[in-house]
Amino acid sequence: MFCEKAMELVRELHRAPEGQLPAFNEDGLRQVLEEMKALYEQNQSDVNEAKSAGRGDLIPTVKFRHCALLRNRRCTIAYLYDRLLRIRALRWEYGSVLPNSLRFHMSAEETEWFNHYKKSLATYMRSLGGDEGLDITQDVKPPKSLYIEVRCLKDYGEFEVDDGTSVLLKKNSQHFLPRWKCEQLIRQGVLEHVLS
């Protein structure tokens, strides 16, 4: 059936939970593109035959195939665009370094796009807030307090706070640290926020 593979790509993303990135379906995308190429070539030969032999009975078939081509294109673009939106959201959630489990699900082109996006975002953040720039990925929601209690989930090593003091982050140790310095480590799974 026409457009079935393209619809399966869209269904695959629809079934994936929000915030998760399923593996890039290169095989499915290739099959859709091959179907589109075959439809286009069939249309070209039928149009040429309709012109040369005056066969008007081929026009409805050509229109049908053209509609299938447009639907395949829409589904393919929707699949790729939704993946880019999810990858962009991952930058805000995990920071500039994605876990290997997520990078494994990305195509080479998506990895390249992610790298360009994070560089553009970093350039923009450096242009804000004077000499040091402003990290707009921190405090996505307004904080209730400036300091929070955190527990270290794995050995991390030395962690320097703004006032110059260093804190040794060892597994199961608890600390009272500035929220904005901890949020990145919380998202990476190094720290967890201890709710009293």
Curated annotation (Swiss-Prot):
The keyword Nucleus applies. It is found in: Nucleus; Chromosome. GO terms for cellular component: CMG complex; cytoplasm; GINS complex; nucleus. Coiled coil: none annotated. Keywords: Chromosome, DNA replication, Nucleus. It comes from the Eukaryota. One of its GO terms (biological process) is DNA replication. PANTHER family: DNA REPLICATION COMPLEX GINS PROTEIN PSF1, PARTNER OF SLD5. Belongs to the GINS1/PSF1 family. Component of the GINS complex which is a heterotetramer of GINS1, GINS2, GINS3 and GINS4. Forms a stable subcomplex with GINS4. GINS complex interacts with DNA primase in vitro. Component of the CMG helicase complex, a hexameric ring of related MCM2-7 subunits stabilized by CDC45 and the tetrameric GINS complex. This is DNA replication complex GINS protein PSF1. It comes from Mus musculus (Mouse). The lineage of its organism: Eukaryota, Metazoa, Chordata, Craniata, Vertebrata. The gene is Gins1.
